[in-house]
């Protein structure tokens, strides 16, 4: 139904406007008594064999929603009804910001892809915190970044502000230094500044745990697919040095290789089917070269259950959807979970 009727209608309109409309619509129908239960009965796969413990957290299934879809934690409860095992909110920044000028989101239908240059548009971390205070039972990741106006030399302060604010309201953290849409952000992926940033956050993590009843919160690093093998080896060293919990591989790419759509010349990060192979290569490289020293969440171009299985077999412990969710609809979540069960 989604691919035959709903998607063709939605794809007639501007993608960013459709995104906001979809949020409002799902929020509205979920308030109708019984609708959430019906959605869960259609899409949720309940089976204890899907459960897995990764970086000390028990996930009810291995399929999550990637950051960028529910930036401000407005719809995490309703989205979880579609069968996701976890929801990653953000990227959030210390102060709310508009992001880059519109138009900034483009479909590449021929390539089953999206280009975005959103630029960390969000209402600010405190706005997200207020919504997360109402959470009851949804496993949440907090993806954190820096404000556009913050120089890289001061970036650590922005990450600490977001970390402190979200600490009691998320289950794990993701440090985003790999978006191509904030000027100079990717420079923070270089070994020296990245080690310093992650070590500072990890030190803060240990400090906060001492005054909390909670365990140390897992901190993950989200990396770009455009890193060289040498840079990926640096990432492995950094994870081991700072003792963060793991890596999310990968963010969007700046590559435009093999695209057919007329929108391919738009600047921004490319996600979707063209990223499938490269993100899996990065997962396999990190897993093999590190001797599976840390967990990896695989994301990038998952448009089918087979795509997800390929990433899990390459070394990912969990997977996340974004563009595949838009192109394939919520049935993809159920298909992946059923395929995982079929592989057992």
Curated annotation (Swiss-Prot):
Report membrane topology: Peripheral membrane protein
Q: In which pathway does it act?
A: Pyrimidine metabolism; UMP biosynthesis via de novo pathway; orotate from (S)-dihydroorotate (quinone route): step 1/1
Q: GO cellular component terms?
A: cytoplasm; plasma membrane
Highest taxon, organism lineage: Bacteria
On whether Membrane is a keyword of this UniProt record, the answer is yes
Location in the cell: Cell membrane
Ligand binding (FMN): 67-71, 91, 143, 176, 222, 250, 272, 301, 322-323
Into which EC class is this enzyme placed?
Answer: oxidoreductase
Coiled-coil blocks = none
Q: Which Pfam families match?
A: DHO_dh
Chief subcellular location equals: membrane
Q: Which reaction does it catalyse?
A: (S)-dihydroorotate + a quinone = orotate + a quinol
Q: Name one GO biological process term.
A: 'de novo' UMP biosynthetic process
GO MF, any single term: dihydroorotate dehydrogenase (quinone) activity
State the oligomer form and interacting partners.
Monomer.
Annotated function: Catalyzes the conversion of dihydroorotate to orotate with quinone as electron acceptor.
The protein in question is named Dihydroorotate dehydrogenase (quinone)
Traced from the root, the source organism's taxonomic lineage reads: Bacteria, Pseudomonadati, Bacteroidota, Flavobacteriia, Flavobacteriales
Gene encoding this chain? pyrD
């Amino acid at each position: 139904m989604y691919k035959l009727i709903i998607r063709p209608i939605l794809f007639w309109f501007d993608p960013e406007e459709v995104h906001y409309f979809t949020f409002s619509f799902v929020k509205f129908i979920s308030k109708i008594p019984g609708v959430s239960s019906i959605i869960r009965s259609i899409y949720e796969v309940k089976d204890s064999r899907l459960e897995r413990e990764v970086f000390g957290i028990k996930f009810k299934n291995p399929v999550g929603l990637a950051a960028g879809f529910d930036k401000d934690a407005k719809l995490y409860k309703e989205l979880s009804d579609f069968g996701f095992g976890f929801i990653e909110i953000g990227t959030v920044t210390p102060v709310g910001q508009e992001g880059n000028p519109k138009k900034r989101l483009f479909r590449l239908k021929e390539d089953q892809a999206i280009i975005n240059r959103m630029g960390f548009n969000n209402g600010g971390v405190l706005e997200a915190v207020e919504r997360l205070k109402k959470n009851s039972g949804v496993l949440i990741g907090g993806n954190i970044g820096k404000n556009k106006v913050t120089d890289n030399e001061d970036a650590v302060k922005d990450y600490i502000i977001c970390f402190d604010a979200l600490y009691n309201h998320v289950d794990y953290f993701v440090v985003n230094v790999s978006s191509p849409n904030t000027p100079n952000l990717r420079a923070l992926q270089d070994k020296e500044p990245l080690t310093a940033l992650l070590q500072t956050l990890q030190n803060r993590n240990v400090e906060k745990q001492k005054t909390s009843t909670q365990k140390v919160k897992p901190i993950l690093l989200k990396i770009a697919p455009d890193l060289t093998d040498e840079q990926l080896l640096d990432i492995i060293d950094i994870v081991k040095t700072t003792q963060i919990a793991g890596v999310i591989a990968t963010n969007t790419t700046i590559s435009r290789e093999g695209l057919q759509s007329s929108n391919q010349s738009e600047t921004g990060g490319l996600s979707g089917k063209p990223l499938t192979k490269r993100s899996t290569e990065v997962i396999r490289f990190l897993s093999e070269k590190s001797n599976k020293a840390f967990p990896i969440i695989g994301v990038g171009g998952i448009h089918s259950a087979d795509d997800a299985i390929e990433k899990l077999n390459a070394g990912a412990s969990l997977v996340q959807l974004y563009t595949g969710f838009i192109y394939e609809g919520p049935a993809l979540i159920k298909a992946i979970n059923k395929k995982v069960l079929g592989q057992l």
